[in-house]
Amino acid sequence: MDDLKIFIGGQWRRGGGNPMQSHFPADGSLNATLNAANLDDLHDAIEAGERAWRDPAWRNSLPHVRAKILHKVADLIESRADELAQMQSRDNGKPLAEARGLVMSAAGTARYFAAACELLEGELPTPRQPDLLTLSRYEPLGVVAAITPWNSPIASEMQKVAPAIAAGNAVILKPAEATPLMALELARIFEQAGLPAGLLSVLPGKGSVIGDALARHPRVRKISFTGGTNTGRHLAHVAAEKLIPASLELGGKSPTIVLEDADVEQAARGICYGIFSSAGQACIAGSRLFIHESLYAPLMARLLELTRGLRVGHPFADGIHVGPLINDKHRQGVLDYVELAKREGGRVLCGGEIPADPALANGSFFLPTIIEGLTNGARACQEEIFGPVLVAMPFGDEAALIREANDSVYGLAAGIWTRDTGRALCLSEQLEAGTVWINTYKVFAISTPFGGFKESGLGREKGIQGLKAWMQQKSIYLATGNSVNHWCD
């Protein structure tokens, strides 16, 4: 792949920052080189965005105009689904089938917000007094910042860019340093779809440089970030200092609960998918497993059988379940947590190491891992590992279970497996999590809001709520009678 250029104000140009590279996690080969954006590039992108969103042609555009662009974006994504899936796989190592699913979900996101902006647009009459007409309307914020992670680039980028554009904003997209390919290709797709110049700029670069400066810039009116909790906490402070909104989708240490009446096969398969798909590199991964003591032995036996049968390999190979981790540095971090778990008294039942297959030697692969023998207070149960590592724990008392499931600084997601729907709903109300799955896991609907409790984030993405998050509300009062205010008489 040729050297990449960054995208600013409708122009492709060489970044002014230091050289950076994109590597294929499956074998370490070079995907592309590019020069990162620098602060001058950032200034130009914000200036271009400010001009573009204030342009009356865009500011006064009817919702169907923005919807048409988003539908065209969806058409272009769908027409190139296989190509984009390969690019996504090269960007972060996801198996092709999984990458293609994310590509298609990105197209669906564009279509959803195309429809949503038409439903939401316009003045809404509100209850009023005699001789007074009151209206409420939603307006764009202006230039907004979207800072995205490396684990699901095209999906997470579209979940920010599509509603922001639908709402009428100009977006500065800062992709993760490790995965610039999809963000830059997304810019090309929006350009081909007819989005006016300046409404989307893409600035690859270091988060500590570009991300921080973007968040601090006085003309940036919202920060939306998906990534680590420490960075999210820093950005929340920056937003608070500026008194601007911040949407933060952060880490997780999600509990999965298996009650004594659960279907063993259904639960084992769902648990396996919930932790080991995406090689465990998902904020929602079900990494803490609580199994009722009466079901512990049979469920663990089936879960181990399924896990040992997972195919770990090159993401372009047929039938692969688990691809590589993003890079060797991250893999070492996962391995360090496994070693820590052993020191804390954990027993590794499967995995816990780098695969011995010489064909995988150049990639950042790690075997799916199941550990038992730890308590919920262990660091491996409290800290986000972000890899294919599951810790299993038996429980007997339901009240103690709820306390332990909620004993985490995180509150992103949870799963429940049971045949008793009423009991599951009762449990779901007691779990401190933004999303609770019952007899399924890691499935989504773009129409349903998503976000976390506690240190898993602030705000919501997806759904109408996810569109309103990119807008500000204005109230208008119009006197309809001829009455005169006599206060100053």
Language model features with spans:
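A short acidic/small-residue loop/turn micro-motif
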Residues: 14-16, 20-21, 36-40, 262
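Glycine-rich loop-to-alpha-helix module at the N-terminal edge of alpha/beta enzyme cores
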Residues: 31-120
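Rossmann-like NAD(P) dinucleotide-binding subdomain of oxidoreductase/dehydrogenase enzymes
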Residues: 122-266, 395
